[in-house]
Structures are given as C-alpha cells and as structure tokens.
C-alpha cells in the first residue's frame, strides 16, 4: 500500500456557501420542479434556480475530484504492465457515480469523507474490474469503453483478466486496512462482497448472458438488473452510511432508495444505448440490440420505458427525502443521475 489516502478537502466558497446553507431546505422544491418541468418553477426567483443548479452539479464535481485523487494514491505505481492495465482501466474517465453516491451518503449522515475514502476506492475498483471483464470477447465483446479502447484491446486479454482480478482483491484490501473500527470494516467488507458476488453483480451478469436471445417478462428483467446494476449502487449507499451511529435506523430506506435508483439507472442506460451515438456514450452504441440483449426499450418500447423510469426516479427521490435532514447531498446527485446524457 502506498501510504494511505491524503486528506483532500473541497468546499463551496464565498457567497455560494452561505446561499446553500440558508436555502438548503428550499432546494428540494427547486430541483424537483426543474427535473419534472413543473409549472411552479416559473414562480421561483431566478437566483434560487441558479443556486439549485450549482447545488446539483457542484457536489458531483467535488466528489469526482476527491475520488480521482484517492484512486491515484491507492493503485500500484505505473511502470509494470499489470499496474499500467489497472490504472488504465480505473483512471480512464468515468462518471464516478457510485463513489459520488457513497460520499454524498456519508455527508448526509455526518460521516467525515476521509473515513470513507477507502470504501469509495473499493467501490470504484470493483466497478472497474467488472467493466474490464464485461468487455471481454467471452462476454459483451466490446472494443470501446469510456471513449477509448477497452482494456483487453489496449493491452491483451490475459493482462485484462489479471488486471480485473487484481482490482477485485484490491477493493477488499482497502476496506480491511481502512481507519474505521474493526466491526465497521467487517460490515463494509460483507456489504461489498454480497453486492459484487454470485447473488449480486456477478449473478446479474450471468443472468443477463443466459437470457440473451430470449424474451423475458418485466419482473425477470428487473431481477437481472437488480443484481447486475443495482447491487453495487445499493452497496455504495450503505458503505457511506455504515460508520454513522444512526445507520441501522435508516438501512431499510437506503435499500429502498438503492432499489429504485438502480432500476432507473439501468432504464436510462438502455434508453441511451438505443438512442445515443458511440461518441456520446463512450462505448459502442446499439450493442444491446445487436447482441439480442434484453433491455427495457426492447421489451416495452421507448415511451413505456420512459414512464417506468419516471416512476422509479420519483420513488427514489421519495425514499431519499426520508433520510436524515432530507438527504440534500444525495438528492442533488439524483438530479445529475436522472439527467445524465451518457
């Protein structure tokens, strides 16, 4: 391990900080109106709308900067082929939404960010490893990831497989060596292992592959994505809140939030795959349809997919509102996730 993680601090400065502090409770109304195109936004003062926009977008950039710095510190130094492949796959762009959700949850639960840096890096390491393996010829066979060649194309298949394996094990080493109390570390390890394993992300990927070329029902499709996509999103929320003293009282609500957010995120991903181009997505567009994958647009059409997306987005927002202080940091990220373009 190359030291631990540096203390990296970010904050709103000047008038922006005081505006957000005084208007935080009102921003929920503002961003909800913006998201849903509600008529009431016409009656909201322009400075509130501007503040809401800043409030929605600034946290994501702040969390992205923090996780990039942290990841660069915990990955092995460049210079050897395996280390280079690990860094290529992990540091090569990406939205960092899982790490951002983890940090946002920690913020809303009053958990210092430096105490969850290890967990944020662990989630991103697991996500990067899953993308490496998903892109392999034996699985999704995709040559493009995050706007550049997939890891197995930039290096070779054997190196890509080993880089994914190394990132998988690194994730749990980070959690085991974090500065949190042993009981919390153990709970985080168990949470991530369950999310990434046979009953979570890996099981969902297996179900997705097994269902290729078949027609599924909506519950069957959602069951696959509950593991493939949703498990790691739910884990990120729990990992950020686990160090908090009031975690247990809100665990069920975090599950509910993660459930609906995971489904909404996957529907958005499917819609983008069907409607956006490769340059926008940073990966091969239209690949799901070409491979006979089960997607929401393929099963339901775009209009019905968008309707179900809106339903789960609203239910995610409602769950977040029941978290401590209305979870303003999580809510701000939900707005970014709901309106993502890639």
Please provide the spans of the model-predicted regions.
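Short, Lys/Arg-enriched N-terminal segments with co-localized hydrophobic residues
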Residues: 41-55
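Mg2+-dependent prenyl diphosphate-binding active-site environment of isoprenoid biosynthetic enzymes
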Residues: 59, 63-65, 72-319, 328-338
């Amino acid at each position: 391990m190359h030291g631990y993680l540096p203390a990296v601090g970010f904050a709103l400065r000047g008038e922006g900080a005081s505006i957000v502090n005084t208007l935080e409770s009102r921003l929920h109304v503002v961003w909800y109106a913006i998201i849903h195109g509600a008529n009431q936004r016409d009656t909201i003062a322009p400075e509130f709308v501007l503040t809401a926009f800043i409030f929605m977008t600034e946290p994501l950039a702040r969390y992205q900067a923090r996780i990039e710095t942290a990841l660069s510190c915990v990955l092995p130094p460049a210079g050897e082929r395996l280390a280079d492949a690990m860094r290529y796959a992990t540091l090569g762009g990406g939205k960092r939404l899982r790490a951002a959700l983890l940090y946002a949850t920690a913020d809303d639960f009053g958990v210092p960010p430096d105490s969850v840096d290890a967990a944020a890096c662990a989630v991103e390491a697991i996500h990067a490893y899953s993308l490496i393996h998903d892109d392999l010829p034996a699985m999704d066979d995709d040559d493009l990831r995050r706007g550049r060649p997939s890891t197995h194309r930039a290096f070779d298949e054997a190196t890509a497989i080993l880089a994914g394996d190394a990132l998988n094990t690194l994730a749990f080493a980070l959690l085991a060596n974090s500065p949190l109390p042993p009981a919390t570390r153990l709970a985080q390890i168990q949470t991530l292992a369950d999310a990434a394993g046979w009953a979570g992300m890996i099981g969902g990927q297996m179900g997705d592959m097994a269902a290729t070329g078949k027609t599924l029902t909506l519950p069957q499709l959602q069951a696959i994505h509950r593991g493939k996509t949703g498990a790691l999103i739910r884990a990120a929320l729990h990992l950020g809140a686990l160090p908090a003293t009031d975690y247990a009282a809100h665990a069920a609500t975090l599950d509910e939030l993660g459930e609906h957010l995971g489904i909404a995120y996957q529907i958005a991903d499917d819609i983008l795959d069907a409607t956006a181009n490769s340059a926008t997505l940073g990966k091969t567009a239209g690949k799901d349809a070409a491979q006979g994958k089960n997607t929401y647009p393929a099963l339901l059409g775009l209009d019905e997919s968008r309707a179900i997306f809106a339903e789960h987005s609203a239910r995610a927002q409602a769950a977040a509102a029941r978290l401590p202080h209305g979870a303003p940091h999580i809510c701000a990220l939900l707005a970014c996730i709901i309106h993502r373009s890639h």
